[in-house]
Regions:
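Extended, low-polarity transmembrane helix blocks
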Residues: 1-107, 136-216
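Solvent-exposed, well-ordered loop and adjacent helix/strand elements within mature globular domains
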Residues: 102-142
Length: 216
């Protein structure tokens, strides 16, 4: 666990990024397989993201590796964007696969899934008022908003005009889930996938502001 923590810190700051990324993936895999009883969908997603990062040139920007190469932490190399594309595809796959799985069950099509989830006392972080939980209309509406909303997020995020709005709605959705229900790493991992849709010009402007006039 200590080695995983050190590797994660090294990857975060971009110190020997490729080695650190591979170590993080291998150690995350090892840690998860040694703890099958606490394994959930968030852990699966975290593993997928660690795998993509291990294959990607993660030290090519915002890293100590890049600082050694150019003298500026804020500089960035031009690389093929396939790792970002894989993460983007993963977001849509998660939403569509989740929709299909939910529709094969009983509680989601019946409109009662959200009601059941919010009644699990060992998982609920912030409990809603009893009047809300006992309202069939509100629970039914909430279930279908989540069900249809996630599918629309996974599809509309690819529309050129929609990404900023979709990303904001998606992040808001997962922040809401994260503060109301204990879902482990799932919500943070999903919000990480939304970062892959950040427009390149927005990222470049952000880096230039922090680097100052000497940006490489």
């Amino acid at each position: 666990m200590d080695v995983l923590l050190l590797a994660a810190i090294a990857l975060t700051v971009g110190w020997h990024s490729r080695v650190a990324a591979v170590l993080v993936f291998v150690l995350v895999l090892s840690f998860q397989y040694r703890n099958p009883l606490v394994f959930n969908a968030g852990d699966v997603l975290l593993r997928v993201e660690a795998f993509v990062i291990a294959l990607a040139p993660s030290g090519a920007a915002l890293s100590l590796d890049e600082r050694r190469r150019t003298g500026s932490f804020w500089s960035a190399q031009t690389r093929a964007p396939w790792p970002l594309r894989l993460l983007q595809i993963q977001l849509t796959v998660v939403y569509l696969a989740t929709f299909v799985a939910r529709m094969t069950g009983e509680k989601w099509p019946a409109g009662t899934a959200v009601s059941y989830a919010l009644r699990l006392e060992d998982m609920v972080i912030v409990a809603l008022p009893r009047a809300v939980l006992e309202s069939p209309a509100l629970m039914n509406a909430g279930t279908w908003v989540v069900l249809v909303g996630e599918v629309l997020l996974g599809i509309c995020v690819w529309k050129p005009r929609f990404p900023p709005i979709v990303v904001a709605l998606g992040v808001a959705l997962h922040l809401t889930i994260m503060v109301t229900i204990a879902v482990g790493f799932f919500s943070p991992a999903m919000m990480l996938l939304y970062l892959a849709f950040l427009p390149s010009d927005v990222a470049e402007r952000w880096m230039r502001r922090r680097a100052g006039p000497s940006t490489v």
